[in-house]
Curated annotation (Swiss-Prot):
Biased composition annotated in UniProt, kind: Low complexity: 503-517, 543-554
SMART domains: VPS9 (SM00167)
One GO molecular-function entry: small GTPase binding
Protein name per UniProt: Protein MUK1
Organism lineage string: Eukaryota, Fungi, Dikarya, Ascomycota, Saccharomycotina
Amino acid sequence: MARQLFTPPITNPRFDPNQSIRESYKNTTGGMQFQQNLHEDQNDNERSSCDGDENSTTGERLENNKSPILTKQEIDEALNTVTNLPPELSKLIDIFIDDLKQPKYVRPLSVLQLSSLFQSFYIKFDKASFQHVSSANNNGYYFSGGGSSSFLAAKETLSSGLSGIFGRSRSSSGNSLMRPRRSSSLFSNESISNSTNATQMLSPEEIKKQLKINELNNMKIEKYMELCERDVFKKILIVGTSVSSPNKMKTFKPHQLQTFKVGNLFRNSVEFTEYNKLLNEKILCLSKLSTMNKINLIKFLSLNNGIDPEPKFEEIKDILYEFTYHSISPCEKIKALLKLHEIMTYSQEMSNDDYLSLLIYYIITIVPRDIFLNAEFIRLFRYKKKLVETESFALTNLEAALVFVEGLTKNDFSNELQDKLTVNESKILENSISSRVSLPSKTAIMHKNNGNNGSNLGDIVTPTIQRPDVTRSNSYDGFRTVFDSSLKNIIGKIRSYTPPHPNNTSNNNLHSSNNLNIPRSSSQLSMELSNRDTTEMSRDGSRSTSSSSRSSASLEHGNREFTGDLTVTASINGADKKEFQKSWKKYKGYKFEDLTICELRDLFEIYQKMMQ
């Protein structure tokens, strides 16, 4: 019987099989490696005893270097000074608003097109804010040893990488072996001490300070973006949303509460306004049913027994009014929405279903008007780069609550309640709003990152509105309008003509022998005759009655001449005339937009034959 070999069990818990395999296939370079491994194995127990302390110390060091902790005092000192935009950034807003007010578009912009313009402006303003903060903090970079080195210049210039390889001498002399070599390590102390071109590296304290400066700069840029949204819509509140009319600037008293009507931005998008109108009617209808005790909202929405909506009712009401009526910019509205979310969260164990049920209860009970347009206003006009994480979560919850309300029908209630509904209430609750009004699709259009910047870690990909092409006056539509009017002018000249009186045949022949037989309209003839009479009046100094009678007679003669020539042509080509009439009358019931290119070419050829 053959002897079987067994591998003894591994008793050391620190034994790593993968490391054993790697060490087994590694080339032996000498006894130093084995001694080093033996020394590490002997001191393994000592290292394991202090692993926890070392890991915690290293973690704290990395945490301090990568994400510096800013105190509240440092943040307040940096942001309290930023109350208004700098003049160069405020000028960008003025230019943007003035550009929107220019009548340079063929038709009024829809809310989706307007949103695309705002998002493009936000990206440009964000870049301009970064440049402004960078230029303002050029002297804020940390300098060490009186040198002119910056954070990005803290590296070795000639002693690292390929430059260190190609910088060496190719001489084969024996002394070159003893010469100190340039190190290829980025953090080599030898290269710093030996190389005169090396730049002093930043210490951990200097790196930490620079990271704090960068974090404060990012906060300043975010503050500038909030002020940008505020100032843009405050100026729109003053100048309006129509084409520029400087004489109709709105003025507000100091104590007057400014109210921004979000619906003005959606007036060119009928789908949104109609959807909002129907949703307002349905919310009001449900509120009346609840007030008349026809439905029990708490029972219908299955609110948790531990949640009582009444104690915070007035506070929630004030926040919803602030959200819908008194806030202006998207950042102000989203702050009110976040505050609403914070107040409604009773405990950490509260599920999202309980939160949605409570939010629906407050919406139906308080009845804030145009809440749908306010939610869409945030979705469209809030800077996409900022509408992430908690902001996106709060807005999505509000949209989910509104979707639940718009989908309610009378079939969702009991038969007893359906019998008590009036005709108007039954009509409102007949169908869902989405089945009656179709909004522009958002699901097929995925979020595009702003500009060419990489997406930050933690950003949530959110559906957004595609940037539709904005039609300008020099577009294809403008060309089609011009072509439309010119061709209609040509077709309008094709009219039936009455034959002249037979007594005027001799006069026509006499007149045709002296003039070229070019068909002209009566308006052209009258202009020529009036110009000729004016010339005669300037020569004689006065205009006689015979001259005016002669002009009217000449005009009548010209008209008969024109129709007479066409009559002669038509009598010669009688068969062709019938064919022409039959060919172009078949387009009598057509609209210009319905004609194809071939049919337009056919009409043009008919016109050319008529003019021959």
